[in-house]
């Protein structure tokens, strides 16, 4: 049986950057667990704020957290109340000074996390899994994607035997390293158990900068 490598992990260092930007030796395990705690806490606190990527950078006793969100107004709150409260909670959680950057996602229909989250929430509201996937595919293609593939797995329609069913449109070249492919996996809690939702979105190629070869250099 063929197995697929993680599309983002395969491209890190080529066309993708790391989500955690820090270096440590003896403190590596502590920092890693702290990163996981920060991500879990932020995702829980901002479950309805359409947060996609969480980037973490570290300096001496300082943590910079960058939140990529489609709803920056909801994250910031009136007069910055929500982001101040979040910062205070993260300061208490980590025992360090936390700085929060909020980055708006201009095209949420081209973000695999947000598309997958949308499908998962529809499944929880008992929308037919085929309809949820096809509507998401149409929105993503209209937003300018070159291709999209979705897959829902589990007890579909309450069936006794779990299975997977997916749809695709356009092209999704998983083997092309210069292809900008966004991937995400989400869960939907239904009355029949959990359903897994996978989304691959091909947004075009990222070509490396052309080197200047003038003069034979």
Curated annotation (Swiss-Prot):
Q: Which keywords has UniProt assigned to this entry?
A: Ribonucleoprotein, Ribosomal protein, RNA-binding, rRNA-binding
Name of a matching Pfam family: Ribosomal_S3_C
Question: What is the official name of this protein in its record?
Answer: Small ribosomal subunit protein uS3
Into which family does the record put it? Belongs to the universal ribosomal protein uS3 family.
Q: Which GO terms describe its molecular function?
A: mRNA binding; rRNA binding; structural constituent of ribosome
What does the function comment of this entry state? Binds the lower part of the 30S subunit head. Binds mRNA in the 70S ribosome, positioning it for translation.
Tell me the classification of the organism that encodes this protein.
Answer: Bacteria, Bacillati, Bacillota, Bacilli, Lactobacillales
Q: Subunit details for this protein?
A: Part of the 30S ribosomal subunit. Forms a tight complex with proteins S10 and S14.
The protein's organism comes out as Streptococcus gordonii (strain Challis / ATCC 35105 / BCRC 15272 / CH1 / DL1 / V288)
